């Protein structure tokens, strides 16, 4: 059986790392629309514990998860799980595959 890796998204909340499609900033209009659509459809999970949303995580199940942890931090945690350690100044978008 394949072991699933759990990714800490803050305040004791964890998600299955292999099911993540994207980790995006909540500031853009398309992300706000996606969040609103997920809320209407009952697919929005708020894991911010009442704090400001700093990242939006899109899952393979089409759920949208709100986190109070910065996108860069979540990306670094994800990379660490997968054995690709990123430095604080590394942009995950520019990392070689």
UniProtKB/Swiss-Prot annotation:
Pfam families xref list: RemA-like
Assigned protein family: Belongs to the RemA family.
Alphabetized PANTHER family for the sequence: REGULATORY PROTEIN SSL2874-RELATED (PTHR38449:SF1), REGULATORY PROTEIN TM_1690-RELATED (PTHR38449)
Protein name: Putative regulatory protein Dole_1911
Native species: Desulfosudis oleivorans (strain DSM 6200 / JCM 39069 / Hxd3) (Desulfococcus oleovorans)
Upper classification of the organism: Bacteria, Pseudomonadati, Thermodesulfobacteriota, Desulfobacteria, Desulfobacterales
């Amino acid at each position: 059986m394949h072991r699933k890796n759990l990714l800490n998204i803050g305040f004791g909340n964890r998600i299955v790392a292999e099911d993540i499609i994207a980790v995006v900033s909540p500031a853009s209009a398309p992300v706000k629309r996606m969040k609103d659509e997920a809320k209407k459809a009952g697919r929005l999970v708020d894991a911010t514990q009442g704090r400001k949303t700093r990242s939006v995580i899109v899952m393979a199940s089409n759920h949208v998860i709100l986190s109070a942890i910065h996108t860069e931090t979540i990306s670094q945690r994800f990379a660490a799980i997968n054995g690709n350690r990123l430095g604080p100044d590394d942009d995950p978008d520019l990392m070689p595959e």
